[in-house]
Regions:
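Signature of the SF2 helicase/ATPase Hel1-core->accessory helical subdomain module
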Residues: 4, 14, 20, 37-48, ...
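Walker A (P-loop) phosphate-binding loop of P-loop NTPases
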Residues: 7
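Short hydrophobic/aromatic beta-strand immediately N-terminal to the Walker A/P-loop
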Residues: 1-3, 30
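Residue-level marker of positions within ordered structural domains that often coincide
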Residues: 19-20, 76
Length: 208
């Protein structure tokens, strides 16, 4: 367990050895952050910055080409089956039609299906649960979009072959609760902001 102040480069301090270990041993390392925002920061800033520095220093990492995957809970991904069924409903209110049109423009260009790309406003966030992937509404055996058109499936498949898998505490604990059925098998785990893990575990695994 290591503790350090804000802004001194903790993420770089654990990312570099994690990447090197994963490449040299051909085994995945899972990095768990407290929130999705921190996940996004690692993927969009910290990891690219680190790789850029290594490239400038001409430091070659041992092993094969580095593969990094980000994985979130299923509700972060659009379900094309639910979206398509909704947009075919006649007589939709203008707010819903506008939201579905925005999604139409997006689904033709997105490779991830991750709602983070959309920067949804409050009203759109209220509508999102009607189109997101949902365990209760997942019918893989009768879905025309599964597996090739299922963004959740594709994200999990990408994680299967990754050296570094970036998740959040909620998903990490969800995987634990489901006996490891979400994440690929791993033996090395880095927990960023570990002091938040107990609270999340209480929310995820506790009951009244």
């Amino acid at each position: 367990i290591l503790e350090a102040g804000t802004g001194i480069g903790k993420s770089i301090a654990y990312l570099l050895p994690s990447i090197i270990f994963a490449l040299e041993n051909s085994t995945p390392v899972v990095v768990s952050t407290n929130t999705i925002n921190l996940q996004e920061q690692l993927m969009s800033k910290d990891i690219p910055d680190l790789l850029q520095v290594l490239a400038k220093a001409k430091k070659r990492l041992a092993g094969s080409e580095l593969h990094i995957a980000q994985l979130k809970g299923r509700s972060n991904y659009i379900c094309l089956r639910r979206w398509n069924a909704w947009r075919q409903t006649p007589g939709l209110p203008w707010e819903e039609s506008r939201f579905l049109l925005r999604l139409l423009l997006w689904v033709n260009s997105t490779s991830s299906g991750d709602r983070a790309e959309l920067n949804l406003n409050r009203a759109e966030l209220d509508l999102w649960p009607r189109v997101c992937a949902s365990e209760d509404n997942c019918v893989t055996t009768r879905c025309n979009y599964y597996p090739a058109g299922c963004f959740l499936y594709r994200a999990r498949q990408m994680a299967q072959g990754a050296h570094l898998i970036v998740v959040n505490h909620a998903l990490l604990l969800s995987d634990l609760a489901k006996s490891g059925s979400i994440l690929p098998e791993y033996h090395r785990l880095v927990v960023d902001e570990a002091h938040r893990l107990e609270e999340e575990a209480t929310d995820q695994l506790g009951y009244e």
